[in-house]
Amino acid sequence: MNLNLMRMTNAQKDFLLNSFFEQIMLIPSDKAPAWGKMGLQQMIEHLSDSVRMANGKQPHAEIVTPAERLQAVRDFLYSEREFKPETKNSLMGPEPPPLFNESLDLAIAELQHEVKVWVELFESNPGLIVRNPFFGDLDEDGWTRLFYKHFLHHLKQFS
């Protein structure tokens, strides 16, 4: 990996472990999203679900992206482009699921825990590949890029 890519991945990982949570704590729990139907706590719980795919707690065996589109979505993942507002997730229903945690604080703590489990998993298993239902088989760099884009997308949804 070249040095610039390594620096970018390290900065993205710092965002995922620290800056994201510092910024999310500043958002009022009742703030309406700029788009979409999820409230702040639902969004946090949605991110926890996505991290559990990568940390082995909720593996996803199937790739739902058609084979002929897989390279295009992977090219997006490794580009500077961001997720657009209102990006649809075919694994989610038309309405957000009910809340799982009793409070926003508990949801945030859960997400922090899931992110730490993910980081520890990849640090203790160099070269590990874990399947993502949209982007296919990803290594640590791929998951870091995906989570950076995904977390930033939802942070902008509430900023």
Each language-model region and where it sits:
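Extreme N-terminal tail/first-helix region
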Residues: M1-Q23
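Short, helix-capping/interhelical loops that line the mouth of catalytic, cofactor-
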Residues: N2-R7, K57-I108
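Generic recognition of short, well-ordered alpha-helical interface segments
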Residues: F15, S19, Q42, H46, ...
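Short alpha-helical hairpin
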Residues: L17-E22, T87, E123-V130
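Non-transmembrane alpha-helical segments in soluble domains
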Residues: F21-I24, I44, S48-R52, Q112-V119, ...
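Short, contiguous alpha-helical
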Residues: D30-Y78, E82, I129-S159
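A charged, amphipathic interaction segment
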Residues: P96-F151
